[in-house]
Amino acid sequence: MAQVRHLLGSTPGHRGLRLRIGVDPGGCSGYTYKLALVPGAETGDVVLPQDGFDVVVHTTGVDLLRGMRVDYTETLTSSGFTFANPNAKSSCGCGSSFGSSDDPERTAADAKLPRTQVEEIMEEIRPMLRGDGGTPRSSPSSRGRSAGSAEVHLRLTGACGGCSSANATLTGVIEARLRQQLPEIGRVALVA
């Protein structure tokens, strides 16, 4: 809240500004978070009074954001708002995109491939890639439950995204580890 108050105080004409929190379809996991300073509430907004300012959320996003916590974090390499959303059934390394069981396409994929297991394995792999400045984001896309029939789509970002060794990283590290742990995975593919 302190960072929002600071932003409001340093914005010319800040009186009456509110923090709008919302979601848009898209991103690497299904939805992306939106934050904006806005002059007022609109028709269909829910207004949530905070300590010194109001948060507004349009009613269409309330169910996806209910119970979410927004924090501001600073590290040696970055700073920004972070989201802890109990409605997020999946998320990506960027921290600004999430998947929800309300997304029918994502729900179908999750039902066919154990996304939680894929994500747990990816969490073991990510520190190795982060050491090189890269971050993989996974998205199960299944075509069946039998051994070797499911697919996992990966987006390599950061240094890995532009690296000429991305395919070697994919097959030598990520695909080998995923297929070892989850025999239903037949293919791991890079996506743009």
From Swiss-Prot:
Keywords: Nitrogen fixation. It comes from the Bacteria. Signal peptide: none annotated. Coiled coil: none annotated. Pfam families: Fe-S_biosyn, NifU. Disulfide bonds: none annotated. GO terms for molecular function: 2 iron, 2 sulfur cluster binding; 4 iron, 4 sulfur cluster binding; iron ion binding. Residues 126-150 are annotated as: Disordered. Transmembrane segments: none annotated. PROSITE patterns: HESB. GO terms for biological process: iron-sulfur cluster assembly; nitrogen fixation. Residues 135-150 have a biased composition (Low complexity). Belongs to the NifU family. May be involved in the formation or repair of [Fe-S] clusters present in iron-sulfur proteins. This is Nitrogen fixation protein NifU. It comes from Frankia alni.
